Amino acid sequence: MRRAAVLTAGSWGTVFAKVLADAGARVTLFARDRAIADAINGRHVNPRYLADVRLPDLVRATSSPERALRDADLVVLAVPSQALRSCLVEWAPLVGPGAVYVSLMKGMEAGSSRRMSEVIAQAAGVGPERIAVVSGPNLAREIAVEHPAATVVASASAATAHAVQAACWTPYLRPYTNADVLGCELGGAVKNVIALAAGMLEGMGFGTNSLASLITRGLAETARLGTALGADPMTFAGLAGLGDLVATCGSPLSRNRTFGEKLGRGMTLDQVLAEQRQVAEGVRSCRPLLALADGLGVSMPITRQVERVLYEGLPPLEAVKDLMSREPGPEYRL
């Protein structure tokens, strides 16, 4: 039986632990809060996230990373993107020599503009054949209640991708494989920024035409950056590109969209940060993404305006006006 460690017990980590167990793995979920671990072991629920969803008996929890990682052949990482490097400094020495790291994170490291798989490779000292990325339209709440969904498992190693695919294939989650790790990660990171903009539109009271235009043009700037970095353009038409973008921009379950909606209603960045418990990755990813784009001469006007709203105090309506007043041009350009 496959043994998986999932770190940590946030909403997506908890749900993915359920997925792995439903697919037949023995799972140890690391919860920093011992009370959460005790509740999972005693009542089979995570009382902080998804308290009404029963976890399988194959899911056990611990507040000890050493116990969680002992004998694990899959190490699933579900932590805030900006905390990943410091977490791996502590955890990587506890990981077995043949274990595969699986990233559930969709963000970019501030300062370095590195993708999560790059941070794992550097901080844990492992090759790309031991790293996989899971990305797609995967709102945790919907998967928790077993609404049918699909996802992508990307790895530089076909064997690794297929192994992780088999480990998370259930009657309600259908995983596909992809060799384009860069494209899958980039799609997940940029869509969080676009979802912030989608929330702003909702908060300002705009309608379906506005949202559809934003999603489509957001996909265009994602593809421009991805192509410049060497990603496969087809990736952005798939689950890790368009699929993730549609789900995150359109659902009230999306924390990035919810965050943006509050900005659109007039709250400041500091006010929303103080109110919203869960991490909105797009807030921290927009600047690293822009640094990448600027270095390559790639235009990302939506991401630029989101950054201005977040960090320069630009009113969201002014950001919309700026986007709409840009010089017209062809729809397709690289």
Curated annotation (Swiss-Prot):
An example Gene Ontology CC term for this record: cytosol
Primary location recorded for the protein, binned into one broad class: cytoplasm
Gene3D superfamilies per UniProt: N-(1-d-carboxylethyl)-l-norvaline Dehydrogenase, domain 2, NAD(P)-binding Rossmann-like Domain
Location(s) in or outside the cell: Cytoplasm
Signal peptide: none
Residues at which NADPH binds: 11-12, 32, 106, 140, 255, 279, 281
Name the record gives this protein: Glycerol-3-phosphate dehydrogenase [NAD(P)+]
Annotated source species: Parafrankia sp. (strain EAN1pec)
Organism placement in taxonomy: Bacteria, Bacillati, Actinomycetota, Actinomycetes, Frankiales
